[in-house]
């Protein structure tokens, strides 16, 4: 759900300078008898939607197509590339690292590729972690494992000190794999580089298991997360459907956006209540969640079925119930949310005990299992494409940008646009309508 005015859409990509070097792929394509280079004039339309009555207000908004350029900025043998992985874990971290390394090494002939340990922290002077020399052998099978071989951390965004390190190590391109905070850090690093008139390309690969980046059709790891969450919901459903008034409560990731919860609900078809941050709801009261939960159980019993219910809640839902709590932030500056899952669990318990209604409640929080999982086949393929396109962009001197999938095409997006806001589920859109149709929950649970 995008809320940015047309006049504020600026997708111009910064470049370090004129590209004069021949791309090593020229020889490969020559042997193939064809050329697959991207022309700088090749653009992707921002919007494929058109209202014949009103016209297309995004008609002139175009995105730069990703892919290899015939002329590149850097001389491959002079390249020293660095890779960071930052923030929370996400399925596909290792797949992206592998793709970047293999593309640099096998396509461009780059031999100086460094893995930075523990995110931005590893670029600070006080870091005791030396860079890791990366090559195709080192990353050969890392895609089979969850987590990141480089380690990760939050915070550490000190642009001056980080650029000091990049300059001292003669790094001339850096790939930052991370979420909103990481990419905001990338932008600060790129701006410090610009101040010093250094020729260092800063390219981001957007990582958010919540799928909440602006102008990114799909974040890597998201499909794996939904797949794992569906398995957790299935377990909750089996538990709930095996007990009288059985209730399965599952909490999944989704701080500000409920994409994982919504996609999981629609994928599983076992969810009866899906609670997301985008929609306010009341727990108690005549039209509150608890009343509707009780009604669901009674209706099932009247149909001579096993009365049961499955509730799926995103971690950022219902945070209004903690407004009186002191606010805390993590090292990346993100607001730390209270556990709405446990809160709802306690409220359900209080409600049914007060009414002397027999029930069984199972609470499942698969968050850390989900985010530490290896990428599934679809995400692994996607990560490979993201990594290779990130390398093509950096070699062409593109900077202050990240790789995105948009209208099924890989494109370049300025980092400043990707972090301008959060992508959210549209509660008035067709997708959420389908979720409501699947769960059968009321359109509103507000008193």
Swiss-Prot record:
InterPro entries: ATP_PFK, PFKA, Phosphofructokinase_dom, PKF_sf, PyroP-dep_PFK_TP0108. The gene is pfkA. It holds the Pfam family PFK. Its EC number is 2.7.1.11. The active site is at residue 210. Keywords: ATP-binding, Cytoplasm, Glycolysis, Kinase, Magnesium, Metal-binding, Nucleotide-binding, Transferase. Catalyzes the phosphorylation of D-fructose 6-phosphate to fructose 1,6-bisphosphate by ATP, the first committing step of glycolysis. One of its GO terms (molecular function) is ATP binding. Its cofactor is Mg(2+). One of its GO terms (cellular component) is cytosol. GO terms for biological process: fructose 6-phosphate metabolic process. PANTHER family: ATP-DEPENDENT 6-PHOSPHOFRUCTOKINASE 1 (PTHR45770). ATP binds at residues 88, 154-155, 179-182. Substrate binds at residues 208-210, 253-255, 315, 368-371. SUPFAM superfamilies: Phosphofructokinase. Gene3D superfamilies: 3.40.50.450. Belongs to the phosphofructokinase type A (PFKA) family. PPi-dependent PFK group II subfamily. Atypical ATP-dependent clade 'X' sub-subfamily. It catalyses: beta-D-fructose 6-phosphate + ATP = beta-D-fructose 1,6-bisphosphate + ADP + H(+). Pathway: Carbohydrate degradation; glycolysis; D-glyceraldehyde 3-phosphate and glycerone phosphate from D-glucose: step 3/4. It comes from the Bacteria. The record marks 181 as: Important for substrate specificity. Homodimer. This is ATP-dependent 6-phosphofructokinase. Mg(2+) binds at residue 180. It is found in: Cytoplasm.
């Amino acid at each position: 759900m995008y809320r940015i005015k047309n006049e504020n859409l600026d997708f111009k990509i910064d470049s370090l300078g004129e590209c004069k070097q021949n791309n090593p792929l020229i020889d490969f394509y020559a042997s193939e008898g064809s050329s697959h280079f991207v022309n700088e004039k090749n653009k992707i339309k921002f919007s494929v939607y058109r209202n014949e009555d009103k016209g297309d207000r995004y008609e002139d908004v175009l995105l730069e197509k990703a892919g290899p350029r015939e002329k590149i900025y850097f001389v491959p043998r002079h390249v020293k590339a660095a890779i960071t992985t930052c923030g929370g874990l996400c399925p596909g971290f290792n797949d992206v690292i592998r793709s970047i390394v293999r593309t640099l090494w096998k396509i461009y002939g780059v031999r100086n590729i460094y893995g930075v340990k523990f995110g931005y922290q590893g670029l600070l002077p006080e870091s005791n972690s030396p860079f890791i020399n990366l090559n195709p052998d080192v990353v050969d099978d890392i895609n089979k494992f969850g987590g990141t071989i480089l380690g990760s951390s939050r915070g550490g965004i000190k642009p001056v000190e980080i650029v000091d390190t990049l300059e001292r190590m003669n790094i001339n391109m850096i790939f930052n794999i991370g979420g909103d905070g990481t990419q905001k850090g990338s932008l600060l690093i790129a701006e410090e580089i610009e101040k010093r008139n250094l020729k260092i390309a800063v390219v981001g690969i957007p990582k958010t298991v919540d799928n909440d980046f602006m102008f990114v059709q799909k974040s890597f790891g998201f499909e794996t997360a939904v797949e794992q969450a569906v398995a957790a919901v299935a377990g909750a459903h089996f538990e709930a459907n095996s007990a009288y008034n059985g209730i399965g409560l599952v909490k999944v990731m989704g701080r500000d956006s409920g994409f994982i919860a919504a996609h999981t609900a629609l994928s599983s078809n076992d969810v009866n209540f899906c609670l997301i941050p985008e929609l306010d709801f009341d727990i108690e009261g005549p039209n509150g969640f608890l009343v509707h939960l009780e009604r669901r159980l009674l209706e099932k019993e009247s149909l001579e079925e096993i009365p049961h219910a499955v509730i799926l809640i995103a971690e950022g839902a219902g945070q209004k119930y903690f407004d009186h709590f002191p606010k805390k932030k993590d090292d990346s500056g993100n607001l730390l949310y209270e556990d709405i899952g446990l809160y709802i669990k306690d409220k359900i318990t209080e409600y049914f005990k007060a009414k002397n209604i027999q029930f069984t409640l199972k609470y499942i929080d698969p968050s850390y299992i989900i985010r530490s999982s290896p990428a599934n086949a679809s995400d692994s393929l996607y990560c490979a494409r993201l990594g290779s396109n990130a390398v093509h962009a950096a070699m062409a001197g593109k900077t202050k940008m990240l790789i995105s999938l948009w209208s099924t095409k890989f494109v370049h997006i300025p980092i400043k646009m990707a972090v301008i806001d959060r992508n959210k589920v549209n509660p008035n859109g067709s997708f959420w309508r389908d979720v409501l149709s699947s769960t059968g929950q009321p359109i509103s649970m507000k008193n």
